[in-house]
Structure formats: C-alpha cells, structure tokens
Amino acid sequence: MKNAYYIGLMSGTSMDGVDAVLVDFSGPQPQLICSHTEAIPSHLLKGLQRLCLPGADEINRLGRLDRNVGQLFALAVNNLLAKCNIAKEDIIAIGSHGQTVRHMPNLEVGFTLQIGDPNTIATETGIDVIADFRRKDIALGGQGAPLVPAFHQQTFAEIDKKRIILNIGGIANVTYLPGTSEHVLGFDTGPGNTLIDAWIQHVKSEPFDKNGEWAASGKTNPDLLAQLLSHPYFSLAYPKSTGRELFNQAWLEQQLSPFNHLDEEDIQSTLLDMTCHSIARDVIKLSPEGELFVCGGGAFNTQLMQRLAALLPGYKLDTTSALGVDPKWAEGIAFAWLAMRNHLGLPANLPAVTGASREAVLGGRFSAK
C-alpha cells in the first residue's frame, strides 16, 4: 500500500517548543515515522508571552510575530525532513496548529486566534499547508476546542471499554470514550503545566519542574488550594475551553498575594495539586471508574502521575504508550490527522464536545505553488 504521509505541527500553551511529526495514515492506525522538536528562541518566546496579554502596539507585534512563528514552523518541518531523510514531494500536506495568542469563545461574538502564517510555511517548505482548524467550529457556535477528542475516538476507542484520554499540556483536557453508542465527551479541565511551569520559571529560571521534584519537596497549603480551585471556570458546565487568558502569571500573582508567607516549594506543591484536583474532579464526574491514559508533557511528571493515581483509585492509570501512541507526540499526530481529514473532505469536530451546531471539515488549505 502506498504511504500516506502527513506532517503535524503543534505548539501549545506551554510554549516549550514546536513539535513536528511525520505520520503515515495508510494503515488502520497512524504510524509515527519521525519526530523533531524545534526550540523557540528566547526573544520570540518573550514576544509571544507578551502578546498573550493585552498591551500597546498589539497589531504591529501580531503581524511581525505571525511571520516569525511561520518561519519557525517552516524550520521545524525542514529539519524534520532532513532528520527523516524524506523528500518534500512525498508529503501530502502539513497540518499546522499555529500558536494560540487569544482564545475567547464565550464573548457575544466569540473568537480564537492562532498565529504562524501558513503562507510562509508553505513557501519555505514547498509543501501545502492546512491550518486555521479552530475558527470553523467557532463560526458554528462551538468553542473551537478541544479538537483532539475526534482523533482520540478514532485511535483509542474500543467497544465495551470505558476510557478517558487525558492530555496534559499547558492546559489539560479530557476525552471520555464511553465504549458504547453514547456521545464522546471532551473539554478543558483547566491548567495543566502552565502554572507550575510559570512558577518555577519565575523563582528558579528553570523551564519546568523535572519529574515534579520541586513540588515533591514542598507541602500543599489547603487554604491556597481552596482559593485556587474556587475559580469560576471549574464550576462551568461543559462544553468549555480555556487558556492563558484566564490562567496566567498575572492571575497567579494576584492569588498568591495573601500567601506571601509561604515557602516557594509549598506554592509549587499547591499548584501541582490544583492541576491534579481539577482533573480528578472532572474525571470522576464523567465516570467513577475506568481506564485513564495520559499524554502530553504531564505524562512525564512522576509526581503529577502519582498524585493523580491517589485521587483516582477507581481508575487504571497509564500513558498512551500502552495504546501504541507515544505520549510526547500525541498532539502533533492529532494535527497531522486533522490535515488528513481536511484533505479527504471529512469532518473533524465533535459537536457534543465543542458545542458546534454540526460536524464540519476544519481548516483551510494554503498551496505551496
């Protein structure tokens, strides 16, 4: 059978690099052929973090960063192809998520905005690009997120097996696969790594808390934890989605101001528990027991996985590796899958997940010609 090669490009709210994956969809399950992470240069990272919050001169900064991110994504593709020794002519299309700089679906006229000019990516790689996956769903009254549950359903669902797929990136999201004819459900639970990363970056200038070791050295403060979990987002009914607009450094500093007597490692432990408790609450609401498979950066945080397991005694906990998908690359593979769905003219959103009025083909095609 002829290969069906697509590339997926993903940079999430954690902004810890651009993941590029080459995936073959010619078989019944996606096959990861090659993967690469392109680091985000510090000057670009600072610009993106600034743009995620309201500020002056936004349109000029947006325009420049849109091109800069497009160039970085193109570099990620070219380095991936060099690493794999695959010719650009063998790739059907690139699926590019872009970099989210605003996600505000709940306004009177909701919107979401991802940058990383697909024209630039197409021009600099010589490969057609499919991008702008979220805004069609928003135009249909949906949240535009999460989009990965449709991929999770096709890849991980099994008859008579109740499964939850938990993706822990900057924001955490769950997909409930009931194993029956019931609707698949999915939504953002709240912060994943974004606040624990922000705190260790602020205090120690380290990019992330490896294995949760710093959090493990601290003691959770119950009063701070209760305050953090009182955020209105956690009591919203799904469909729901969130991002840095709600959970960011400025919000964190505001929450911490009455608790400046706490040790820094105790704050880190409490932030980790905020992530774990908010996830566990939503998982238990979906089903008190079942199988839980974790992907995303959080799957590699030993302390996070241990705390989550303790909060979910009714669940068998593992990573998506047990289902044949490397947890580090799962989201990149999902955006290659979204590109494939667009190329074949197939819908890729789940209205029961996003709240859209109907299924739709997502994304637009940007030709390299």
Swiss-Prot record:
One of its GO terms (molecular function) is kinase activity. It catalyses: 1,6-anhydro-N-acetyl-beta-muramate + ATP + H2O = N-acetyl-D-muramate 6-phosphate + ADP + H(+). ATP binds at residues 12-19. Keywords: ATP-binding, Carbohydrate metabolism, Kinase, Nucleotide-binding, Transferase. CDD domains: ASKHA_NBD_ANMK. It is an enzyme of class 2 (transferase). Pathway: Amino-sugar metabolism; 1,6-anhydro-N-acetylmuramate degradation; Cell wall biogenesis; peptidoglycan recycling. Its EC number is 2.7.1.170. SUPFAM superfamilies: Actin-like ATPase domain. It comes from the Bacteria. GO terms for biological process: 1,6-anhydro-N-acetyl-beta-muramic acid catabolic process; amino sugar metabolic process; peptidoglycan turnover. The keyword Endoplasmic reticulum does not apply. Gene3D superfamilies: 3.30.420.40. Belongs to the anhydro-N-acetylmuramic acid kinase family. Catalyzes the specific phosphorylation of 1,6-anhydro-N-acetylmuramic acid (anhMurNAc) with the simultaneous cleavage of the 1,6-anhydro ring, generating MurNAc-6-P. Is required for the utilization of anhMurNAc either imported from the medium or derived from its own cell wall murein, and thus plays a role in cell wall recycling. This is Anhydro-N-acetylmuramic acid kinase. It comes from Shewanella putrefaciens (strain CN-32 / ATCC BAA-453). The gene is anmK.
